[in-house]
């Protein structure tokens, strides 16, 4: 970044904002980059501002029992705020003085007032000077107030972030992500521009008092008639505003419903295409869109009338002020035109400035109170450690999480349940396990490990393993007992947290660099091969949570970070969840057992190999110590521990009834037990009321950016970013984000891809806490890159789940004193980590975009023509009256009084021509502004255009190839459907209407003035030319600065979410100072762009006003010097010239707003123009009597129409090559093999070898070459969707969209309830569905969070059974399953797909043993394709991975022992990253 010219700018340069000329010139000539932006002045840097405010806030906390944040702000900013307020007041006072001088100028043309004619020129000079003074006062004052607002926002941004890093985990569980993001977006954004209006809360009343005094002097009591009209108008506008909010509130729920479904569609677009659900999703979203648009139109009409009422009110105010006085006493022209000028100022003060100021204070004080409450929340406590201690000891440790009483929770749950539309017939479903809430997470834990020992912690789901580690870290505070260790701790979370930066920075993490240690860690964690594949090696920048890495790569980087730190105690929480068997084995031996052999280690695991090599084993069960000792002691004392804890061995021996009972209990335990708020309907915010049954089931919220996993319901989510965020300020437990934009300002729409987009979160019954985000895991198999995007709540932050054992903890770990923190931050790395891709659209909206927008709907052209006809008719009528006026010079009749008294022209008889003219012009302007015959059709048609564009964009996204979608960020896609569609619905129609109406008013006024005085037209031409050139010059730069500012906003929210996700790691490593510095860096980048945008905008506004001042000076002197005795002409010319000044500037701003908003149209068109992957084949809806398989009939020249395809499931793959993008690197090369009908094939290979990619290639989701045949039919001769229907899919990332069970199983409505129940019974879902009220009509929300991951897998299995697919693709189906559901799936696949071809990608050896053949993929190619016997007889990956015990299972005849073995200790299921263990949900 360059040094800002502001530092050395002169006073004159600062006054006229001339220091911004270099950036304006550069932006006009070329596209601006971040490097072109000026550095933030030191006075605006986040470090300095936050330090000052933090110092004053600490002072406030120390000195008072009830500290007030506003007092700290007052001490920091008050005097400058007062100074700029005085300047603003002086500038506004000039508006009241101008009409007085105008009246004197008109009076000087009185034929009997010759003595004043000589001073008319001086009065004109004085009037012009007032305009100059106002310009020099108002612009610095407005900019100064905006600058103060910006500084206040920056300081509070930083204060909130620092506080967030200090909050106890217990508090974090009670604060929603929505509340945090709202504090940093909605609330604080009000300060930047709103502060400029704050002073009008006292300026406007003073101004009204002054103006009414002057009007009293002119019209006596009649002046109050005009005031009464303005008050009535203000009340009418308030009523319209209330009605508008009513419709917007009703619409908010519908918008969120649509955005939730859209977000789920985008997040799971690969699954949507695999299931061929494009048509179903399109219909579902369009139905919601129709209901939303009805309310959108009503809200738009209310706002339209509000806007129109302001314009036409001017005539009535003047008319009702003057008319009584004229009837009673007669009136002179001077008083008429002076009254007009006074009323213009009065109307602005009463209807715009004062209400705006009151709203600003209301919003600002509310935001300050929210921030004040947040800053006073409980912080985590620093634990005391003994640095000389070498052992780790726990003595009689017990810990609780929940502080809230059980009775209160139960009452809330019952109340929520009673409020549901579908009654719950079995309340036990929601309340059966609430008694566990009062139970401790850990009970009476005792153990002692010496230096250098390895403690393996095992246990079932929810046993308390992670809680144990959190206790050692200090995040969970023990209620009894004591913990003893040195405090020098390193921690590896099971959540594979990756911070923005390079691989090397992620591993070193601020610790001093040691080359030998670094290389040793890389080697031990098996990262050498992965790093060597990157061109930048370990300096490759990982953005957005490392989403471009595989799950295994992220897990190994997280482990390497923990191992690299030199600590006394290493806490490793299930670090091997996403590693293949071979890699896991190598890392455990080389890293855990060798590299860290002399260190104390606590490893959470359930693998038998790990338990055997541990020095001590601690097995937890329901929070208690089930066993503590060595492995040999475990074999002797607890030989049945595996079946005791997991229910694994005995499951197949249970009866069908017993299995159903176990499955039902699994649903309760895994889905509902831990979260007391599972069935709570939190209080809905008044402004976001839901309508309809579907809306009753959820929160009005969608967080476009981060999904976390539900406790026990283990489903990986990919973060999206969203725009627009609302929050309930009254209820601290409220979990709500909203994408509903503030229709009053385009900047109010934040998405935040970047929010940070994120996935959807319904306003449902589950708690959306920050802790959910900490326990969130990014989907490991997703190929998208997710983010949140900026300009309007781009940020997509949405935790989608709770956790289990990651309870809420309230203590901090002391910072490691040995850390050498490196605070250097590379700006390019920061940009690469955080920024969105630069939009490939022109810096200024092209005429082609306008033309294309106008021609979307043919009615729009007709409406615009109709508007033009009305305008021409009004102008023609005005010109006719002017012609009559010019050709019928009135003879003025005088009201003569006694001699010595002066006479004044009174409005009677012929003189009333002027008065009649003014009435006519007022009526014409009223029709022009109100536009009843023009405005309503225009607004209505523009909303229809928005509807058409949304439909086209939705269809385009659904039909776009995955290669195109993979190149886009999901947050960016969601922003098109949220922020941009909101702009097309709300802002663009009314902004276009305002611009057209203002432009026509200005053109009409110029026409009138030019007819009265043709010389003025000569002055108008250069003014218009200057305006057009200046606008074009400014737009090139301003739009680029706005885009850079929008991109710069994303890092702020992304960094907040990143920090929260890794908060436990941050605290364990003591990296809070580094992340505060990183946050300030991101904040300064945004400030640099925003400050420069405000400065250039003020430069432009000032230049526009200077041009208008010159124009007014020219008009004034031309009219004075060329007009004869006509008072009327001078009055009309000067009054309209003053009106032109204000209206034209408003029109200029509107034109800039239109151009800015039209960029959303450009982005939508860009999505509409995406390529299509193939014409969709309409789904065939069979009759109820048809067999299920009849749906697979295809129209193809190779198959007879009476035949059914596929019939056997034979697959022949020839030279298959796959690429993510066309022309990219091949990720699979020359794959060839064949599969016989009904054969089971297992895919083998290391993490990232391409197993999941091969399954995607089968579905034609990638760019592929080669050929695949199914039962002799080639994919080249088969329609794309029909080809995909041949496959049944159980993906690694399960897709449950928001809707009923029936809709999720049968989105097209093809099957009867009887058929659905039959399939549900086959896959073991019947007992699950029957537990819910409404059964098949129960509405699932938030990705089906009330279901465990296993039940979601069963849903996918049921879909495949319903489709009667002959080929089943399974991608890690058991990755996140409890053993019970895993057995159900294994049994169902054996039975339901006994005659089908099955292709399985799996990490569990026992599942792979059932396959007849194995395809070994290595380095993107097929290395082996053979039977299991052949692979075991050769040296292969499979032989290295399989254990001797598994070989005995395969070949039992090789075991000479004939006796029946007793209960064996079998491998406990390894709990993966998503299997968050928690005893409280």
Swiss-Prot record:
Keywords: ATP-binding, Cell membrane, Chloride, Chloride channel, Endoplasmic reticulum, Endosome, Glycoprotein, Ion channel, Ion transport, Isomerase, Isopeptide bond, Lipoprotein, Membrane, Nucleotide-binding, Nucleus, Palmitate, Phosphoprotein, Repeat, Transmembrane, Transmembrane helix, Transport, Ubl conjugation. Residues 81-365, 860-1156 form the ABC transmembrane type-1 domain. The keyword Membrane applies. The modification Phosphothreonine is found at residue 718. GO terms for biological process: bicarbonate transport; cellular response to cAMP; cellular response to forskolin; chloride transmembrane transport; intracellular pH elevation; membrane hyperpolarization; multicellular organismal-level water homeostasis; response to endoplasmic reticulum stress. There is a cross-link at residue 689 (Glycyl lysine isopeptide (Lys-Gly) (interchain with G-Cter in ubiquitin)). Residues 1471-1481 have a biased composition (Acidic residues). ATP 1 binds at residues 401, 435, 459-466, 494. Residues 1453-1481 are annotated as: Disordered. It catalyses: ATP + H2O + closed Cl(-) channel = ADP + phosphate + open Cl(-) channel; chloride(in) = chloride(out); hydrogencarbonate(in) = hydrogencarbonate(out); ATP + H2O = ADP + phosphate + H(+). It is an enzyme of class 5 (isomerase). A motif (PDZ-binding) lies at residues 1479-1481. Residues 1453-1462 have a biased composition (Basic residues). Its EC number is 5.6.1.6. A lipid is attached at residues 525, 1396 (S-palmitoyl cysteine). The chain crosses the membrane at residues 78-98, 123-146, 196-216, 223-243, 299-319, 340-358, 860-880, 920-940, 992-1012, 1015-1035, 1097-1117, 1132-1152. Signal peptide: none annotated. Residues 424-647, 1211-1444 form the ABC transporter domain. Residues 1387-1481 are annotated as: Interaction with GORASP2. The modification Phosphoserine is found at residues 550, 661, 671, 687, 701, 713, 738, 769, 796, 814, 1445, 1457. Residues 1-77, 147-195, 244-298, 359-859, 941-991, 1036-1096, 1153-1481 are cytoplasmic. InterPro entries: AAA+_ATPase, ABC1_TM_dom, ABC1_TM_sf, ABC_transporter-like_ATP-bd, ABC_transporter-like_CS, ABC_transporter_C-like, CFTR/ABCC7, CFTR1_ATP-bd_dom1. Glycans are attached at residues 895, 901. Monomer; does not require oligomerization for channel activity. May form oligomers in the membrane. Interacts with SLC26A3, SLC26A6 and NHERF1. Interacts with SHANK2. Interacts with MYO6. Interacts (via C-terminus) with GOPC (via PDZ domain); this promotes CFTR internalization and thereby decreases channel activity. Interacts with SLC4A7 through NHERF1. Found in a complex with MYO5B and RAB11A. Interacts with ANO1. Interacts with SLC26A8. Interacts with AHCYL1; the interaction increases CFTR activity. Interacts with CSE1L. Binds and hydrolyzes ATP via the two cytoplasmic ABC transporter nucleotide-binding domains. The two ATP-binding domains interact with each other, forming a head-to-tail dimer. Normal ATPase activity requires interaction between the two domains. The first ABC transporter nucleotide-binding domain has no ATPase activity by itself. This is Cystic fibrosis transmembrane conductance regulator. It comes from Cavia porcellus. The gene is CFTR.
